């Protein structure tokens, strides 16, 4: 390997560069995107996200949870993918939450990016938008989501039909089937 490469090159600079490159360690994946300063901690628990949305969440429900890195696609958003085994296939749902402090100037673009991510990269059958009931523009958000086929599925006291648990009372769940 290393000797054969050196035999083909007679330059000491090339030899030195090849030797250095052969022993170079690739750094770990960064936790911050240099493009926009967004932090992402892939080891942070998606279970914790789901437990905040569904206080009765129990990891023993037989559902798998993973981190889809929503905040890298849409800063200010968080989320988790929940998977159920359905025979030979996995039925997957992407749950997302927008912080109340999120910049709304790109809201439409972010929602479309989330829908694209869910169908393309995450292979989810639906996206559940977990909206804060206290949002000043909740009515217009609901209208926009209904326009793309969204349905309110998790009002306070109402079980989410997919997980079968009630969300915290501060959230309204809106499901868009893909």
Short names for language-model regions:
Residues 146, 155-157, 170-172:
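Intrinsically disordered, low-complexity, Lys/Arg-biased terminal tails
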Residues 140, 167-168:
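Charge-rich, low-complexity amphipathic helices
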Residues 134-137, 170-174:
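Noncatalytic linker/hinge segments flanking ATPase motor cores
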Residues 129-140, 158:
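Conserved beta-strand-loop-alpha-helix junction that forms the acyl-donor binding cleft
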Residues 161-165:
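Ankyrin repeat (ANK) tandem arrays and their immediately adjacent linkers/low-complexity segments
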């Amino acid at each position: 390997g290393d000797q054969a490469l050196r035999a083909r090159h007679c330059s000491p600079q090339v030899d030195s560069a090849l030797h250095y490159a052969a022993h170079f360690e690739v750094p770990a994946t960064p936790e911050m995107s240099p493009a926009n300063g967004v932090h992402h901690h892939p080891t942070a628990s998606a279970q914790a996200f789901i437990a905040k949305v569904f206080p009765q969440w129990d990891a023993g429900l037989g559902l798998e949870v993973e981190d889809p890195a929503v905040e890298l696609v849409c800063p200010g958003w968080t989320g988790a993918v929940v998977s159920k085994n359905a025979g030979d296939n996995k039925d997957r749902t992407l749950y997302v939450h927008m912080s109340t402090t999120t910049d709304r100037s790109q809201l439409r673009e972010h929602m479309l990016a989330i829908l694209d991510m869910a169908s393309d990269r995450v292979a989810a059958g639906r996206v559940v938008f977990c909206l804060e009931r206290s949002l000043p523009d909740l009515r217009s958000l609901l209208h926009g989501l209904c326009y793309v086929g969204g349905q309110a599925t998790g009002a306070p006291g109402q079980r989410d039909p997919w997980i079968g648990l009630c969300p915290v009372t501060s959230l309204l769940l809106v499901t868009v089937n893909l």
